[in-house]
């Protein structure tokens, strides 16, 4: 007896090079089999005829923190698109990351984060990030390193938005930063 059987869908599993019409059996929240489960019993049956059944997708560049102008809701955008993991690409800065964790921890999708080298993160209504290395240097580099030490499983990299509106004439100075 299974908890859920997803029947009659086109199952695409790139990792196992599987692409065929099949059923998916789920028990205790885990996929326990892919194949013919037409005669198997389950508490719930979902008919996926005409639909694709696939492992959760990864959005590798999202802005999920709703306190930034670009922020989006994971429930409204990720879940309907089969995204189960999203990488927030620098919405929070190193000085605001700990505040953003409150939101991130409530998301229904798994979130990993690139922390912005700008202390405040991405701009809100006309404020551009401060990425001047003269401002970031010394003590701030240590604070960024300590943030990564504290949240090793959550933070996966650093975001530096490189466009002329943000970096202006600091390109050479920025290329010399090592964090």
Tell where the protein language model's regions lie, with residue ranges:
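Charged helix-capping and loop-helix junction motifs
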Residues: 72-73, 172-175
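Conserved small/polar residues in nucleotide/adenosyl-binding loops
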Residues: 177-179
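Active-site gating/metal-coordination segments in enzymes
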Residues: 129-173
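Metal-cofactor-binding active-site regions of metalloenzymes
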Residues: 81-87, 91-92, 106-135, 159-166
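Histidine-rich, glycine-flanked metal-binding segment
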Residues: 1-54
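Short acidic, glycine/serine/threonine-rich loops at helix termini
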Residues: 98-100, 123-129, 170-172
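Metal-associated gating/positioning segment near the N- to mid-region
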Residues: 37-40, 47-106
